[in-house]
A protein has these predicted regions:
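ATP/NTP phosphate-donor binding region
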Residues: 1-59, 69, 73, 77, ...
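Structural motif
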Residues: 6-9, 64, 131
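Short beta->alpha connector loops
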Residues: 40-42, 64-67, 194-195
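Periplasmic-binding protein-like
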Residues: 57-63, 188
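Phosphate- and divalent-cation-binding pockets in alpha/beta enzyme and binding domains
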Residues: 70-71, 92, 224
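Catalytic core of DAGKc-family lipid kinases
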Residues: 76-174, 179-186, 191-193, 200-202, ...
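ATP/nucleoside-binding phosphotransfer catalytic cores, i.e., glycine-rich phosphate-binding loops
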Residues: 189-246
Length: 246
C-alpha cells in the first residue's frame, strides 16, 4: 500500500494542476494511495510508523528538497520503502537521484526500482541533504588524521545528497557547486579573515571527501541540518551506508 505525504506548500493554487495531473497518472499506474498533508512543525516519524502498522509498504514524499530532508532525517529508521515525487523549484536532490520534476516522476515511481541510500549521522541524529555550520570559531578534525584550524572564523558545509552552490564573493558572477559523492560525505571548508571592525573576507575554500569528521568550538556554534538549526559545542559526523530503502 502506498501513502503519499504532501508538503504544505502544495496547497498553493499554482500547484493545483500539476498535483491533479500526478494523481491521475498514479491512478493509471495502479499506485494511487492515501494522501496525508505535512505540517513542518510535526515530526513525520510517528505518523509514518502509524501508517506502517496499518499496512503501508511505501511512503512517497511529494514536494522539494526541504520536504525530502524534513521527512527522511526524522524517519530514516522506519521499516518501509520511500519514494519521491518532486514538485516545483528547489529540487536539486531530485536531479542527483535522476528523478524528473513534475508529472514525469510518476513513471519513475511506477517502475518500482529500488536503491539503498546513504545518510549522514550527526550527534545521534540523521541528515540526508546537507549540514551547514555557519561562520564560527571552530576547528575541524577528519578521518582521525587531519586537523584544520583558522585564526578567525570558518564556514563548514557537509554534503550528502544535496549539492552546495557557492561564490567567492558578492561580485563573483560564476556559481560553483560541490557535488556529493557515492559512498562518501563531501566537505566544504572556507576560512574567514577579519579585515575591519565589522567585516570579514572569505579565503579560498578546501573541498574534499571524508568518512568521519569532528567539529569543535570553544563556544556554542549554529548548525543547520535538513532545515533544523541547533547550537552545538562539538559535532561528530559520519556516513551511515545504505540506510534508506528507496
Amino acid at each position: 500500500m502506498y501513502v503519499y505525504i504532501y508538503d504544505n506548500f502544495l496547497r498553493a493554487k499554482k500547484y493545483a494542476s500539476v498535483v491533479k495531473a500526478m494523481e491521475v497518472n498514479l491512478t493509471d499506474y495502479g499506485i494511487a494511495g492515501k494522501i496525508l498533508r505535512l505540517n513542518n512543525y510535526i515530526d513525520a516519524k510517528p505518523i509514518i510508523d502509524d501508517e506502517i502498522k496499518r499496512g503501508a509498504k511505501t511512503i512517497v514524499m511529494v514536494g522539494n528538497d526541504q520536504t525530502f530532508g524534513h521527512i527522511l532525517s526524522r524517519a530514516a529508521t522506519c521499516e518501509c520503502s520511500f519514494g519521491f515525487l518532486p514538485v516545483g523549484p528547489n529540487n536539486s536532490i531530485a536531479e542527483v537521484l535522476g528523478i524528473p520534476v513534475g508529472v514525469d516522476a510518476c513513471e519513475v515511481l511506477s517502475r518500482r526500482r529500488k536503491e539503498r541510500l546513504d545518510v549522514g549521522w550527526m550527534n545521534n541524529r540523521y541528515f540526508v541533504s546537507q549540514l551547514h555550520v555557519l561562520p564560527a570559531k571552530v576547528e575541524v578534525f577528519y578521518d582521525e588524521r587531519f586537523r584544520v584550524t583558522t585564526n578567525d572564523k570558518m564556514e563548514v558545509v557537509v554534503c550528502n545528497l544535496q549539492p552546495f552552490f557557492w561564490k567567492f564573493n558578492k561580485k563573483d558572477t560564476d556559481l560553483r557547486v560541490v557535488h556529493p559523492q557515492d559512498g562518501k560525505l563531501e566537505a566544504f571548508l572556507r576560512p574567514l579573515t577579519k579585515t575591519s571592525w565589522w567585516g570579514y573576507t572569505y579565503e579560498d575554500p578546501s573541498i574534499f571527501p571524508f568518512e568521519e569528521m569532528e567539529i569543535r568550538g570553544e563556544e556554542p556554534f549554529a548548525v543547520e541540518a535538513d532545515g533544523k538549526v541547533t547550537k552545538e559545542i562539538k559535532v561528530k559526523i559520519k556516513l551511515a551506508h545504505s540506510k534508506i530503502d528507496m
